[in-house]
């Protein structure tokens, strides 16, 4: 999937996350995580977001995750929504 613009999904409410995905020309997928539980769950958050992005076929992207205690299913849903918005795609594969 080719990213065309910046895609954002989520909120900064408790138990949610805000995911921002933007295109990158090269460098693979770079993930920046901001979370109060990063020391405890940072690796799992990164793994979940990275696997979801790769599953959608994205090869180069800059991703910012602002986590407020989101569970995995919320991270996956928010990441998919942000990627589809960044790709300006309506061809959802749920």
From Swiss-Prot:
Function statement: Covalent carrier of the coenzyme of citrate lyase.
Sites bearing O-(phosphoribosyl dephospho-coenzyme A)serine, chain numbering: 14
Top-level taxon in the UniProt lineage: Bacteria
Broad class of where this protein is predominantly found: cytoplasm
Subunit record text: Oligomer with a subunit composition of (alpha,beta,gamma)6.
Protein name in the entry: Citrate lyase acyl carrier protein
InterPro entries with a match to the protein in the record: CitD (IPR006495), Mal_deCO2ase/Cit_lyase_ACP (IPR023439)
């Amino acid at each position: 999937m080719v990213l065309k613009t910046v895609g954002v999904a989520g909120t900064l409410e408790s138990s949610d996350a805000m995911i921002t995905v933007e295109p990158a020309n090269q460098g693979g997928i770079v993930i920046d995580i901001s979370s109060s539980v990063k020391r405890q769950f940072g690796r799992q958050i990164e793994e979940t977001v990275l696997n979801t992005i790769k599953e959608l076929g994205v090869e180069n992207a800059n991703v910012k995750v602002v986590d407020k205690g989101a569970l995995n299913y919320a991270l996956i849903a928010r990441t998919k929504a942000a990627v589809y918005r960044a790709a300006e795609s309506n061809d959802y594969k749920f």
